[in-house]
UniProtKB/Swiss-Prot annotation:
Ranges per topology, Mitochondrial intermembrane: 1-14, 88-227
Name of the protein in question: Cytochrome c oxidase subunit 2
Membrane topology designation: Multi-pass membrane protein
Transmembrane residue ranges: 15-45, 60-87
PROSITE patterns: COX2, COX2_CUA, COX2_TM
GO cellular component: mitochondrial inner membrane; respiratory chain complex IV
Length: 227
């Protein structure tokens, strides 16, 4: 999860987030190299009065600064498209969970079970227990099995919301009248926090998301106790 004064990304917990982290580093290195080259050229222009007459009208230079940016854009676009298709690909999900956004709480329905659904509200600050996180704890966590592909169907009952869990690389808009889907998969057990990431009204900041990823056997015991 995030912590105060954090500069980097949250620790990746899903394969998608690992790919996004690698793509971020890849793109950042390209930006760093281009910025260094531009700053070097600017410093030369400011500190010297020398000019190269052939650079004012040179076919070779014009060819290079046309082809090189195209190559750089391709190096950025190809891995980006690969990750984009990976995020949309859902093959044989082990479980499907329907998520509905409301003003200002989330409701969850496990569609593979006959009667397993609940609402998830933020716990008020006055009701927090020692060790709980302010504005992030909920009364009903969504419990999912780890190391299995899970399909999330996301929509909204009223206004625009966005269901986001950064450490899992998830951010999907909840739009009234439209059903979006996302894949959830975790490499390890634990608690993973998120929040509504679309301004949806006066209590937008009070719509936390808490995912509890557990082993399959633990999930089966939990689902049995909830039905």
């Amino acid at each position: 999860m995030a912590y105060p004064f954090q500069l980097g990304l949250q620790d990746a917990t899903s394969p998608i987030m690992e790919e996004l982290t690698n793509f971020h580093d890849h793109t950042l290195m390209i930006v760093f190299l281009i910025s260094s080259l531009v700053l070097y050229i600017i410093s030369l222009m400011l500190t010297t009065k020398l000019t190269h007459t052939s650079t004012m009208d040179a076919q070779e230079v014009e060819t290079i600064w046309t082809i090189l940016p195209a190559v750089i854009l391709i190096l950025i676009a190809l891995p980006s498209l690969r990750i984009l298709y990976m995020m949309d690909e859902i093959n044989n999900p082990a479980l499907t969970v329907k998520t509905m956004g409301h003003q200002w709480y989330w409701s969850y329905e496990y569609t593979d079970y006959e009667d397993l659904c609940f609402d998830s509200y933020m716990i008020p600050t006055n009701d927090l227990k020692p060790g709980d996180l302010r504005l992030l704890e909920v009364d009903n966590r969504i419990v999912l099995p780890m190391e299995l592909p899970i399909r999330m169907l996301i929509s909204s009952e009223d206004v625009l919301h966005s269901w986001a869990v950064p450490s899992l690389g998830l951010k999907t808009d909840a739009i009234p009248g439209r059903l979006n889907q996302a894949t959830v998969s975790s490499n390890r057990p634990g608690l993973f926090y998120g929040q509504c990431s679309e301004i949806c009204g006066s209590n937008h900041s009070f719509m936390p998301i808490v995912l509890e990823m557990v082993p399959l056997k633990t999930f089966e015991n939990w689902s049995t106790s909830m039905i």
